[in-house]
Amino acid sequence: MKWYAITLSPSNPTLSSDELDGICAELMDRGALGTTVERAPEITCYIQGDEDALKGFLAQLGDLPCSLQATNEVSESNWTGSCPEVWEPIHAGNLVVVPVESSEDTRPVPEGALRIIPGLGFGTGHHATTRMVLCELSAFAANPPDKHPSVFDLGTGSGILAIAAARLFQVPVEAIDIEEGAIMNAKDNIALNHVEHLVSASTTPMQDIKGSFSLILANLYGEVLVQLADHVTRVATPGATAIVSGITELVWDQVHEAYCEKRGWRLVRENADSGWVCAVFER
């Protein structure tokens, strides 16, 4: 998985700071993981993905009052330094997430807050997809059908969802991701939050997962959720809850069909934010 920096030039070079902020917010809503304005009015945004993801992101920018100036692949280890919004605390339900630069970061944080180092497994809760899962997870924890759920985090990224679940329920959590770099980032965050005894993170392929889980968390692209629907159903216990996100409104119907119409899941609730959908399914 690659990181790309995309530089845009607004059509109106005299935009106010509020107008520039509006364009930056729109880019985040459309999937950018960070934005910066180093040489106003030029805006640089950052995305993660392969070349198809890059093409898809660029294709949806046609209605913005900007022209494309440059697209560059950037180092995954350096880009976060260019994005000040990465470091803002996030409140999601009863959870607070505080991004930090490293385990040596000694800034005070609210009691009980999750500390997350941004990295290849980007996931600090800033993006709507992650934030909605955290909110749903917080709500689930307030009135769980099982106070000690067996938890599986599919596509763990930075480990934020697995860490949150471990903190909320004090139960073991199995987390996987296909990216070795993401798992390294997740393990750093797991240690940072002192839940190494609860969370295991690995690159184990989904088809090799043998356990059964009553709570499944999956913040993935909607198309991937469709592809993995059989495996998600296979590892779910009867009555299991799945909180899924990363779904664009364009593919939501496909995800609903794959889980509810074809595999017997029941839609409990769906939420939308900035063009993204998060859903809670029960088996």
Give residue spans per PLM region.
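N-terminal auxiliary segments of SAM/dcSAM-dependent transferases
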Residues: 2-107
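Short structural boundary motif marking the start of a folded domain
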Residues: 2-4, 112, 277
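General small-molecule cofactor/ligand-binding pocket signal
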Residues: 36, 72, 98, 174, ...
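A short helix-to-beta-strand connector/capping loop
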Residues: 64-68, 93, 110, 171, ...
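SAM-dependent Rossmann-like transferase core, predominantly class I methyltransferases
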Residues: 77-145
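Conserved SAM/SAH cofactor-binding pocket of Class I
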Residues: 120, 124-205, 209
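S-adenosylmethionine
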Residues: 178-283
